[in-house]
């Protein structure tokens, strides 16, 4: 079963619980604050284009590790606006240029699919996820 909610700017937010999806609350003041708040409130969030296969791969990997990532799917016409907001968050969090799919861990830009896969293969991903409270094992 899948559930999403739309906010004013056509961003759809979902968070996974096992194989089901439940909506996240997006009640904030401004449009830039909406994305910032969602990034800061979730231990792990995956942000990508609607229907992006790489976003799906990241999500499935994290689910396989026992992490329940929030997922932000954006429409192509809003992509530039969201990327601009994410780069502002990334600058404060020590990040840089944001490319989709983007994974934020502990409110900071972690990277994309390549970084997630590389840290998983090297065995560094699980300790990072434990450190931010996304895993309790």
Curated annotation (Swiss-Prot):
<dbReference type="GO" id="GO:0009751">
    <property type="term" value="P:response to salicylic acid"/>
</dbReference>
<keyword id="KW-0963">Cytoplasm</keyword>
<dbReference type="Pfam" id="PF00462">
    <property type="entry name" value="Glutaredoxin"/>
</dbReference>
<keyword id="KW-0813">Transport</keyword>
<keyword id="KW-0676">Redox-active center</keyword>
<comment type="similarity">
    <text>Belongs to the glutaredoxin family. CC-type subfamily.</text>
</comment>
<dbReference type="InterPro" id="IPR036249">
    <property type="entry name" value="Thioredoxin-like_sf"/>
</dbReference>
<feature type="domain" description="Glutaredoxin">
    <location>
        <begin position="32"/>
        <end position="136"/>
    </location>
</feature>
<dbReference type="GO" id="GO:0005737">
    <property type="term" value="C:cytoplasm"/>
</dbReference>
<dbReference type="GO" id="GO:0009863">
    <property type="term" value="P:salicylic acid mediated signaling pathway"/>
</dbReference>
<dbReference type="GO" id="GO:0009867">
    <property type="term" value="P:jasmonic acid mediated signaling pathway"/>
</dbReference>
<dbReference type="InterPro" id="IPR002109">
    <property type="entry name" value="Glutaredoxin"/>
</dbReference>
<comment type="function">
    <text>Has a glutathione-disulfide oxidoreductase activity in the presence of NADPH and glutathione reductase. Reduces low molecular weight disulfides and proteins.</text>
</comment>
<feature type="short sequence motif" description="Responsive for interaction with TGA factors">
    <location>
        <begin position="134"/>
        <end position="137"/>
    </location>
</feature>
<keyword id="KW-0539">Nucleus</keyword>
<dbReference type="InterPro" id="IPR011905">
    <property type="entry name" value="GlrX-like_pln_2"/>
</dbReference>
<keyword id="KW-1015">Disulfide bond</keyword>
<comment type="subunit">
    <text>Interacts with TGA2 and TGA6.</text>
</comment>
<dbReference type="GO" id="GO:0000122">
    <property type="term" value="P:negative regulation of transcription by RNA polymerase II"/>
</dbReference>
<keyword id="KW-0249">Electron transport</keyword>
<protein>
    <recommendedName>
        <fullName>Glutaredoxin-C9</fullName>
    </recommendedName>
</protein>
<dbReference type="GO" id="GO:0005634">
    <property type="term" value="C:nucleus"/>
</dbReference>
<feature type="disulfide bond" description="Redox-active">
    <location>
        <begin position="52"/>
        <end position="55"/>
    </location>
</feature>
């Amino acid at each position: 079963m899948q559930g999403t909610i739309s906010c004013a700017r056509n961003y759809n937010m979902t968070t996974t619980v096992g194989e089901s999806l439940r909506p996240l609350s997006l009640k904030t003041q401004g449009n830039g604050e909406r994305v910032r708040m969602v990034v800061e409130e979730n231990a792990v969030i995956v942000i990508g284009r609607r229907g992006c296969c790489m976003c799906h791969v990241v999500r499935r990997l994290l689910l396989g590790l026992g992490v329940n990532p929030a997922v932000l799917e954006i429409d192509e016409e809003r992509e530039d606006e969201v990327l601009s907001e994410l780069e502002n968050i990334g600058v404060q969090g020590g990040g840089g240029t944001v490319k989709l799919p983007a994974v934020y861990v502990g409110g900071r830009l972690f990277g994309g699919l390549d970084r997630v896969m590389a840290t998983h293969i090297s065995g560094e991903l699980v300790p990072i996820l434990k450190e931010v409270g996304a895993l309790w094992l």
